Amino acid sequence: MSEEMEPKLLNTTMSRRGFVAMSGAAGLAAFLAACGGSSSDSSSSGGDAAADGVTAEEAAAGKSFDPATEPGGPIEIFTWAGYDDSPEEGLPAMWEQYIKGEYESASPLKWTFLEDDQQALAKVASGYNPDIIHPCIAYTQQWKDAGLIQPLDLNLLPDFGGIPDAIKAGGIIDGAPYHMPFDVGFSCLTYDADQISFDKVGGKESWEVLLDDTYKGKMALFSDDVAIIKIGHLINKGAVDPNKMTQEEIDAAKETALKIKPNLRNYWTSQTDTVNDFVNGNLIATYTWPDGYWKIKNHPKMKDRNIKYMQPTQGRLAWVCGMVLSANTKQPGRASLAMAAANTPAAAAALTDDFQYASGQQQGVAELIKNKELIKAFQIDDPAAWAPPNAWFEAPLPNYKDYVAAGEEVKAA
């Protein structure tokens, strides 16, 4: 990491999905090809959506909006903390195209922050009405079934075709596009290798270390009900898909999670808080997204410390998140233009350089990324790092409520 980037990195409050330069990199491209995905040509200059890497069926199934006829007023974005406009950090990058456009004065952007996918869905279902929401793609069907989102107008999203099919597939429902993938990455433990030993769990990096009471009070996990249960399942079953659990397996994973709980300092809701806990000596292992690992590793207090991002034998958790359009927005066209700004190659590259974040957007991004070190740091040139059993991407869960109920029981115990 360059000296110029370090202050910006360490000062940022970004507390969401920190991944890296996957956009356009050879390793990810190979992985997507193996999954049947592709990366089609697109540009942010607009034009026929179908000609820009979007199928005619997708374009036809979407909506059609006219920004010029909309009433104005703030466009509210319900997103993860840190994804707002931060001019003091020089970081309005993901919204810059909209902010410099013709509608910003009449329809300025406004941000509110969610805690996790379950909380966001519950809040909007209870009557909160933002214009844009930032859920993970595995939850798209639930948002649609609840009547909370509507199809996208791909003519207002000219770079949508630059998102490979394998990434956007989960957001296409009944042929219509509902979800614009934005950020992609891993979830795993960041740990101090000088203080954590895996000798009691077979000598290799493993989620089982959470059961080792040697580190009681010095470890932490994210307060996400589904993730808590998936980790328990990976400990119980090894490298087995945690998206396909029976009720018996959920119950067993809950029991394992209950055994982990006494060893934890907390279940965190803000990654910024757990990063601070770590660098201040309160933790030696915590669940983070890649940006959390990068912040800890490069913090001045961690100088000469052997900070690692775990690659457990059971596999990392992984995710695709992005933006959906509220069914109740009065400005769907202008909200779509804000989404389009976040989907440009320039915005994707800036997220990588400034926050170690990558985008679902693949086209023309790699050459725009300045810090090539990030590609190596997060195995972007290694397709195997993204495939099972090394990584388990989120997927729709038919028994989602059972996962959540079990996770809630663990936290309440």
What does each model-found stretch correspond to?
Residues 276, 382-413:
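Conserved C-terminal helix/tail region of periplasmic/extracytoplasmic solute-binding proteins
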Residues 321, 325-387:
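Mature extracytoplasmic/periplasmic domains
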Residues 36-46:
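Bacterial lipoprotein signal-peptidase II cleavage site
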Residues 66, 122, 129-135, 150-190, ...:
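A structural signal for short loop-to-beta-strand junctions that line the ligand-binding cleft
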Residues 150-161, 179, 303-317, 326-329:
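Short beta-strand->loop
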Residues 59-142:
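Early extracytoplasmic/lumenal segment of secretory-pathway proteins
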Residues 140-142, 220-232, 241-308:
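Ligand-binding pocket segment of bilobal, Venus flytrap-like solute-binding proteins
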Residues 1-14, 25-33:
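N-terminal secretory signal peptides
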